[in-house]
C-alpha cells in the first residue's frame, strides 16, 4: 500500500511540475532527498509511464493544434512548403526547436543526470530562473504570436529546453522565459513550449518503452505503470489547463516568488 501511495504521489508531482514552471526534475530530486521518494525503485517501466502520461496530457489538450500542424506538415511534403501558412510555419518552428534539444539530450543526458544531481544545484537554479522570470516580464514586449517567430528564435528556445536537463531549471520555465524575451505573448510562449514538448517526450518515452517491452513487466510493475500513467496524465492535463488560463491573465511573478521561497526553504533545511 505504501508503494502504491508513493506511485500516486510521484505521478501527481510529475504531472503537475512538468508543465508548471517550477522544475519537475528539481522537485523529484528534492522529494528523493528529503522524503525518500525515489521513482528509480519502481524501475524503468514507471519512468516510461510518467513520460507517456504527460505526453497524453499534451496531446489531448492541444489535439486541435497538433492535428492542424500534422496536416499542414503533410501538405508541405506533397504540395511544397508555404511557410506563410500559419499552421505549416508553426509545425516547422516546433521541428526546428526540437532538433537541438533532442541532440543535446541524447548526447549529454547521462552527464546531466549524474554530474549535477545535487540539492544545491536545484537551490541555485530555482532562484536564478526565478530572477529570469522577473527580467522577462519587465523587458519582454509580449505582443507576438508563436507563428511570427523566426527559425533562429525557435532554435534558441530549443536550446533553452535542453538546459532543463539540469535539475531546478524547468523545461517550461526556460522555454517560456526565452519566448517572452523574444516578444511572445505569455499564452503564446506557453503554447509553443507545450507543443514543442510533445516530440521530445514522445521520443524519450519511445526509446525507453522499447527497453521495457524487451524486459517484460510483472504484475506489480504493471500496476505501478498504470497508476503512474493515469496520475501523471490527469494531473498533467489539469496543470496545462490551469497554466494556460493563468498566464492569459497574470504574469509569471507568482512563480518567481514561489521559486525564491522554495530555494530559501531548501537552503535552510540543507544548512540545519
UniProtKB/Swiss-Prot annotation:
InterPro entries in UniProt: UppP
A biological-process GO annotation: cell wall organization
Bilayer disposition of the protein: Multi-pass membrane protein
Signal peptide: none
Alphabetically ordered keywords of this record: Antibiotic resistance, Cell membrane, Cell shape, Cell wall biogenesis/degradation, Hydrolase, Membrane, Peptidoglycan synthesis, Transmembrane, Transmembrane helix
Superkingdom of origin organism: Bacteria
Pfam families for the chain: BacA (PF02673)
Transmembrane segment boundaries: 42-62, 92-112, 120-140, 149-169, 194-214, 224-244, 252-272
GO CC aspect terms: plasma membrane
Subcellular location: Cell membrane
Reaction catalyzed: di-trans,octa-cis-undecaprenyl diphosphate + H2O = di-trans,octa-cis-undecaprenyl phosphate + phosphate + H(+)
Leading EC class: hydrolase
EC number: 3.6.1.27
GO MF terms, alphabetically ordered: undecaprenyl-diphosphatase activity
Family: Belongs to the UppP family.
Role summary: Catalyzes the dephosphorylation of undecaprenyl diphosphate (UPP). Confers resistance to bacitracin.
Note: Bacitracin is thought to be involved in the inhibition of peptidoglycan synthesis by sequestering undecaprenyl diphosphate, thereby reducing the pool of lipid carrier available.
HAMAP family: Undec_diphosphatase
Name of the protein in question: Undecaprenyl-diphosphatase
Source organism per UniProt: Rubrobacter xylanophilus (strain DSM 9941 / JCM 11954 / NBRC 16129 / PRD-1)
Gene that encodes it: uppP
Amino acid at each position: 500500500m505504501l508503494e502504491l501511495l508513493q506511485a500516486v504521489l510521484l505521478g501527481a508531482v510529475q504531472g503537475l511540475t512538468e508543465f508548471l514552471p517550477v522544475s519537475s526534475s528539481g522537485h523529484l530530486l528534492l522529494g528523493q532527498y528529503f522524503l525518500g521518494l525515489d521513482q528509480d525503485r519502481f524501475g524503468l517501466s514507471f519512468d516510461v509511464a510518467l513520460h507517456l502520461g504527460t505526453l497524453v496530457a499534451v496531446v489531448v489538450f492541444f489535439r486541435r493544434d497538433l492535428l492542424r500542424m500534422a496536416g499542414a506538415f503533410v501538405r508541405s511534403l506533397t504540395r511544397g512548403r508555404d511557410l506563410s501558412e500559419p499552421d505549416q510555419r508553426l509545425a516547422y518552428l516546433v521541428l526546428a526547436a526540437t532538433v537541438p534539444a533532442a541532440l543535446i539530450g541524447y548526447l549529454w543526458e547521462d552527464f546531466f543526470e549524474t554530474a549535477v544531481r545535487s540539492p544545491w544545484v536545484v537551490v541555485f537554479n530555482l532562484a536564478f530562473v526565478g530572477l529570469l522570470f522577473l527580467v522577462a516580464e519587465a523587458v519582454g514586449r509580449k505582443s507576438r504570436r508563436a507563428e511570427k517567430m523566426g527559425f533562429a528564435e525557435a532554435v534558441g528556445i530549443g536550446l533553452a529546453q535542453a538546459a532543463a536537463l539540469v535539475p531546478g531549471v524547468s523545461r517550461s520555465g526556460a522555454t517560456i522565459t526565452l519566448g517572452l524575451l523574444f516578444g511572445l505573448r505569455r499564452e503564446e510562449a506557453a503554447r509553443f513550449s507545450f507543443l514543442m514538448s510533445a516530440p521530445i517526450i514522445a521520443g524519450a518515452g519511445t526509446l525507453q518503452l522499447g527497453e521495457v517491452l524487451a524486459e517484460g513487466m510483472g504484475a506489480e510493475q504493471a500496476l505501478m505503470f498504470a497508476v503512474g500513467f493515469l496520475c501523471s496524465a490527469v494531473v498533467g492535463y489539469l496543470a496545462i489547463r490551469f497554466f494556460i488560463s493563468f498566464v492569459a491573465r497574470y504574469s509569471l511573478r507568482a512563480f518567481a516568488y514561489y521559486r525564491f521561497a522554495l530555494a530559501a526553504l531548501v537552503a535552510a533545511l540543507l544548512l540545519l
